[in-house]
């Protein structure tokens, strides 16, 4: 129940990858025929991915994952456009790959506006317009939030960016396999994606860069990826990611409809069968696989540990920050107190999740919640006084 953290590799994806581990293991940058077969596989993958998002093949750049893609997009755009301006607009609920990159740039002379969100995690379009300055060079807003699932008004943001001639980047790591994305209709100039979020391999991602966007390299060295991303291609990873992307988009409508039905069933059971819970994130403009609740009078980490003992995987936020004792920056940004933020639990399903599995998980959450609350003096006091 933690598919937002990562997903299982599909068997069809693994089969597609296998030849490039031990049979056709050549370096695609070499000139001999053996290597050119590997290069052809990389280029076929590039063509496939481009077709899924309405892009040209030469606008797809393979990376090591979402964090690298985010870093590349933000840093390279800032460097390339520093003569034009030094102002970047983003939001307070972005992934840390964006936020920490922006903080790095602030230490190096750039100015960053961190937009507030409402209680559902939604960006205010008017606030974006009001934040634009003559020196604004980049807007970076995630397509959908990784913790609370809220889907942002990306098409409207893209229209604003195009109107003001500002580059628009979106982190679509969570959205890519669940929402049809057309980079042209949404006026997206750069987009980050990571393969392991949609049943592809870890260590493979891509950055879409519109041809009109002239940014430099993040990693320097060889001439791979048209001299914009040095390093030997991860051929099995690239091939596997493309196969996973094709499978995800082939069955997207069916899978999404099923996930929404199961998600809403999951949410309904939690809300109807456990007292003092609060759904985090937008109720309808939400990723089809995301469930995030505050369960009051229950410490989130304790809940997760006890669920883990029952073989149930869940999280209290992003897997990238799971070792931190600080409250989720996303939950505090939507107005939760530190105390309430620490009562949160994120569950995320996949197209393989069944109603029977959800029923098992809900029953375990109910048992664990009852047990933890029985040890909580705050819960006892609240119930007695109300």
Protein language model regions, located:
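Pyridoxal 5′-phosphate
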Residues: 1-386
């Amino acid at each position: 129940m933690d598919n937002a953290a990562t997903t299982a590799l599909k068997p069809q994806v693994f089969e597609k990858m296998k030849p490039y581990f031990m049979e056709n293991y050549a370096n695609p940058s070499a000139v001999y025929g053996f290597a050119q077969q590997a290069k052809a596989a990389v280029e076929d993958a590039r063509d496939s991915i481009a077709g899924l998002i309405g892009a040209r093949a030469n606008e797809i750049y393979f990376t090591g994952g979402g964090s690298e893609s985010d870093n590349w997009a933000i840093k390279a755009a800032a460097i390339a456009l520093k003569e034009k301006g030094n102002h970047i607009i983003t939001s307070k609920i972005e992934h840390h790959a964006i936020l920490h990159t922006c903080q790095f740039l602030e230490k190096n002379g750039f100015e960053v506006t961190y937009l507030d969100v409402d209680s559902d995690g939604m960006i205010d379009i008017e606030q974006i317009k009001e934040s634009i300055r003559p020196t604004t060079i980049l807007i970076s807003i995630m397509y959908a939030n990784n913790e609370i699932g809220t889907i942002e008004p990306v098409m409207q943001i893209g229209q604003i960016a195009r109107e003001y001639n500002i580059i628009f980047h979106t982190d679509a790591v969570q959205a890519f396999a669940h929402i049809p994305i057309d980079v042209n209709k949404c006026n997206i100039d750069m987009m980050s994606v990571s393969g392991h979020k949609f049943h592809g391999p870890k260590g493979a991602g891509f950055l879409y860069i519109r041809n009109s966007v002239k940014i430099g390299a993040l990693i320097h060295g060889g001439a791979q990826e048209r001299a914009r991303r040095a390093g030997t291609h991860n051929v099995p990873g690239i091939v596997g990611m493309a196969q996973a992307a094709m499978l995800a988009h082939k069955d997207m409508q069916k899978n999404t409809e099923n996930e929404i039905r199961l998600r809403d069933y999951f949410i309904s059971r939690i809300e109807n069968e456990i007292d003092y819970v609060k759904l985090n994130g937008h109720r309808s403009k939400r990723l089809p696989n995301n469930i995030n609740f505050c369960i009051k009078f229950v410490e989130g980490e304790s809940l997760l540990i006890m669920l883990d003992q029952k073989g149930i995987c869940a999280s209290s936020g992003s897997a990238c920050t799971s070792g931190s004792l600080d409250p989720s920056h996303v939950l505090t940004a939507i107005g939760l107190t530190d105390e309430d933020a620490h009562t949160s639990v994120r569950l995320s399903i996949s197209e393989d999740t069944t109603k029977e599995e959800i029923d098992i998980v809900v029953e375990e959450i109910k048992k664990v919640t009852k047990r933890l609350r029985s040890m909580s003096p705050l819960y006892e006091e609240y119930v007695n006084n109300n």
